[in-house]
Amino acid sequence: MLKLLSEIGPVIAFFAGFFYGGGIQHATLYMLITSVICITLCYVIDKKVSKLSIISTTVLLVSGSITLISGDSMYIKIKPTILYVIFGIIFLMSGIRKNPFIKYALESIVRLKEESWITLSYRTAAFFFFMAVVNEVVWRNCSDETWVKFKVFGVIPITFIFILLQLPLLLKNKLPDSKI
């Protein structure tokens, strides 16, 4: 539950900051503060923070700080693209190297045949590359308000749909001792 809150909390703070705090600058500040609080809580409570969370928070701190200092919202808008490309490369390379990163992230929930982990890695890489393109199209062609709404009401459902589309692979290839 803490992991979910640490992922969604900054998005909610960004949305609230944009619509109730006065625009992208406030939203960025709220998201930076919330992200630092969330990652700190994860470390204090769980005594660990995932590598993906560290990468995500680092990119956020850099792009968010540049946005706040420069006043240019482009930097916070390209943050998702940068993260999606980094994650896409991580999942793609781990699949190519036959050492699927996604296995380490999900193995406590589901146990799969090894070739299924590799397939899931490639699919996840493709999803992240797709999301990078979508983010670029939206932020470059839409208003700040539309981009913010897309981040909250578009990305979450698209991600959920992607996860649902993976269920047949997971259910077909799960090992007998799997939790799902």
UniProtKB/Swiss-Prot annotation:
It is a multi-pass membrane protein. The chain crosses the membrane at residues 4-24, 25-45, 49-69, 76-96, 118-138, 150-170. One of its GO terms (cellular component) is plasma membrane. It comes from the Bacteria. Signal peptide: none annotated. Its main location: membrane. It is found in: Cell inner membrane. Keywords: Cell inner membrane, Cell membrane, Membrane, Transmembrane, Transmembrane helix. InterPro entries: YciB. It holds the Pfam family IspA. PANTHER family: INNER MEMBRANE-SPANNING PROTEIN YCIB, INTRACELLULAR SEPTATION PROTEIN A-RELATED. Plays a role in cell envelope biogenesis, maintenance of cell envelope integrity and membrane homeostasis. This is Inner membrane-spanning protein YciB. It comes from Rickettsia africae (strain ESF-5).
